[in-house]
Amino acid sequence: MVTLRFLQKNRFIHIISFLLVLSSCSSSPELVQVRLKLDDLSKQWVYLCQWDGNQNAVVDSVRTNSRGKAKLEFRTHNADLFAITADKKEFPIVIVANPGDRIVIDGNFRNYKVVGSKESAEVKAMQDRLNSFHNDFEGLRFQLPDSVNTPVNDSIARLINLKIDSLKSEYSNFVKSYVSGNLFSLSSILVLTAKVGEMDVLPYADNRLLFIKVDSCLNRVYGDKPIVKSF
């Protein structure tokens, strides 16, 4: 009986210790590794940036080797949005890093693949889709006649404008579908605020309810993040 009591007490102590360890682990930021393999960035500095409420602030930097390889490491408590740049002006690589992620970015600075982060891969796919939309949009605009003073030119302009409207509607529906299915994802901010030149892909006036819904959802989870506050 004495032994049993001792075992029960000892077991209780072990359980408490185990719970304390779990609590400690859950409150500690986990390591994230980002391995870069960028063919066009040999022996160059690259910068890891994060939105601080006013600008993309540099939080870390690393120099690639002769083969364009480098590794960035940082810690995070939950999902965080980062951009990678070589000149601190353009930010072609955007990642959403979750605790414990081991992300590999392979290719070149403008054309790369992401492995190890589902949401980062989705962001890249959305960027590619936006670039394709931009190219198609500009291609159609280029075909517009300089003048519509003749019936032929007027007819051509009407036809092309119909194609432009159809293209915009198709892409807009695609974006709204993605955002509606990812209301609690930081990537939704990037998608909602995307622009083609000076044109908003999803104008706020026409999509106010969706913007409000995303804002509400993200504030429940990431209300302390500057990028969510800025949104």
Placement of each model-derived feature along the sequence:
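A non-transmembrane, solvent-exposed segment enriched in polar/low-complexity residues
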Residues: 25-178
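Amphipathic alpha-helical repeat scaffolds of TPR domains
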Residues: 184-198
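N-proximal helix/coil linker or "cap" segments that precede and/or mark the start of modular domains
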Residues: 210-231
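Structural signature of alpha-solenoid helical repeat scaffolds
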Residues: 179, 183, 203-206, 223
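Amphipathic alpha-helical segments within well-ordered protein domains
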Residues: 175-179, 192-196, 215-219
